[in-house]
Amino acid sequence: MMKILFVVLINLCSIGAFADNLKEMEKKMIDQDEQRPEVHESIAIASTETFSGTWPFKARYTDAPGFRMHYVDEGKGEDTLLLLHGEPTWGYLYRQQITSWKQYARVVAPDHMGFGKSATPSSRTYWLQDHIDNLESLVLSLDLNNITLVMHDFGGPVGMGLAARHPDRIKSIVAVNSPTPFGQPDIGERLSANVADSPWFQWIVNAESTGILEEVLGHLDFNILSTLKLNGFVDNSIINETWISAYRAPFPTPAFALGAIGWAKGFAVGKHQFEVPTAAAKNEIMKKPAMAIWGVQDHTLHANHFLPLFEAIFPSGEVHLISEAGHYSLEDSPEEITNLVIEFLRGQKSS
């Protein structure tokens, strides 16, 4: 069964000989399972796990959202960079940025419920509004203000949901290959058009209709690499055993994959509801500095479908296209994105 599940995703990837490398590397990782520490309760990764020093940040936790939510809190200052990951990643996606960005602001990087070092409670639902509620609880418990939202993938709808509820706490917006739904009338139309062009969303819809979605995503421990490749990154040289371990670690069993399953399933069955801002909140957010960064080779969230959403809310916002980056542009072009955000922050201080 595991082999079949893996082949399903590999065939969708259509990446030729690279599939053989995926099979080899993931088989090797599976063979190492006996060496992994036993997980306990509903958190898959030990608080002290650094993944061979690539994640050196102190683990912090809050129970404010009603479950044990992990976040890192680095640097100091009145301004806060709030880093929001997407599917099926965690704060590790920002590991190469945190060290640099914390020199300019306080950096808070939470893991959504069911991802990373956060808990995966079995009694909760994992729809968009749940993730917005959880993020809101974290922000209020830490009393974060002057927030620059840095959002990737579904971190965008979550972050924009926070912005709709608390526009006064938001200083600026950075969307990295991330939708920015904020009451635009054509959101549904653009989502539908994107599905027609996206192998990942086509797979989600088909997998749900054929009843295999939960089975496949429940085994991300085995097929994490092929799933990431289907969503899209360009630089295969980033792949090594530590990298694979970090991204597969949150999902040791199907019980720990509820977050990844929930995000995909919620899209397929229409459970994700975007936060709709009030007129006052929309007017306030539209005045904020904003920047969109997009890896052009993103075949999951296409720039031509989603950049117009950003430009509708932020007509004066900066837009940067990275030609040699895919959906996981933070992996493909980490230095370029790091520097773009630093310049963006400097620009706000000088204005």
Predicted regions: what they are:
Residues 1-5:
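Positively charged n-region of N-terminal signal peptides that target proteins for export
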Residues 21-59, 67-74, 80, 108, ...:
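Flexible "cap/lid" subdomain of the alpha/beta-hydrolase fold that forms the substrate-access gate
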Residues 17-19:
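Boundary at the C-terminal end of the N-terminal hydrophobic targeting segment
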Residues 325-334, 338:
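Catalytic histidine-centered segment of alpha/beta-hydrolase-like enzymes
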Residues 340-348:
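C-terminal alpha-helix
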Residues 95, 160-164, 338:
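Short, hydrophobic alpha-helix immediately C-terminal to the catalytic nucleophile
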Residues 73-117:
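Conserved HGGG/HGGXW glycine-rich cap/lid loop of the alpha/beta-hydrolase fold
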Residues 7-14:
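Bacterial N-terminal signal peptides
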